Amino acid sequence: MAKYPVVVYGASGYTGMLTIDWLIDQNIPFTAVGRSAKRVEEMMKQRVVRLESATYEIVETEHTVEALTKVFQGAKVVCNTVGPFVQYGAIAAEAALKAGCHLLDTTGEQAYILDMRERFGESYRQAGLVLAPSTSYMYSFAEIAAELALETPGIDCLETATLCRGTRFAAAGVTVGSTASIFGMARVKQHYLWEKKLVEHPVTASFNVVDPNFMEPVFSLPWSGTSLPVFYQTDSRVRSCISSVGFYDNDVMKLAHGFFQKWEAEFKDLPAEHQDAIIKGAVDSTTPSMPPRERTTTVRTVDFAIGRGQLSAVRATVHGITAYISTGALQTAAVTKLLDGETNKVGFTSACKAFGHSYLLGFLEQRGLARATVQQL
């Protein structure tokens, strides 16, 4: 049973520890949960800032519904950072529901998000609990841009792009878990929203995104489809939403695109255990260990949304830094609202819809993590 109101599940992982950083910064007590208490303690001592001033406990548990339910009981909010979420997320979602906890996670995996909506959305709603996947840089920044665009009357069609800069000659500075999620995209369908229906992207889909922030177009991919088409499918303001992701100053997207096409041609019909081995090999070869903490001089982001109506058009842009550090900040911003019992929506929802895009943007702006601009077109 959790001693404190917030549980961070996956506390020895990169994103979990950055979430803990921000909880400590906001003086929020927490229960750090992982499969190995020893590893959680060791990693937190190495990586977590201001740990000496924190109020917390460390709990070891197995990754089962029964075990996690017992650990989550007593808490109000669970921050789940254990991925790939397609593989591990549903167990934590079921456990949080049984324990009577709100659930935030950091996924960007559209297939998982769709599964959460269908399997748990109504149950969380009836329980008065928030189920908010993708409470993270990907794709809350793009959704903030989309919401800013939707402030213009008449906008009903959205195109969004999430453009990131990381390590120039490496795997874009992503974590081991993120890399596993990326290669795992080859196994699932990717969708965009068209006339209120989710439509599958072709396997070969790619975009050359043009933005005035850059001299050259940025090669981008659907990247599982992102969470935005799912969130906006049930939003009466939006008829269509197409989203993409690109890494500028880095060729990683072209490598990923090649892998996805190779998967379609050679691997898609192999037995599951063979596919698992292929994905593990790809992850190990590109991201063998936890990356260092992000630097503001290296990790910079541009997320924008172009909104169009019959006669209106607008472009909203969110400039940001340090995507994973910003993810920890977004988790903590959401936790702060939930601990005070403040939410605009329960059940399956996005962070923007539950807590307000203006609140999230303000939280980021005041901590030097993002700024936004809006331009009428």
Per-range role (PLM):
Residues 5, 29-30, 157:
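Residues at the starts of beta-strands that form the adenosine-phosphate
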Residues 39, 43-115:
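NAD(P)H-binding glycine-rich loop region in Rossmannoid oxidoreductase-like domains
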Residues 28-39:
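Conserved glycine-rich Rossmann-like NAD(P)H-binding loop of the short-chain dehydrogenase/reductase
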Residues 22, 151-377:
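C-terminal catalytic/substrate-binding lobe primarily of soluble NAD(P)-dependent oxidoreductases
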Residues 107-129:
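Rossmann-fold NAD(P)-binding glycine/threonine-rich loop
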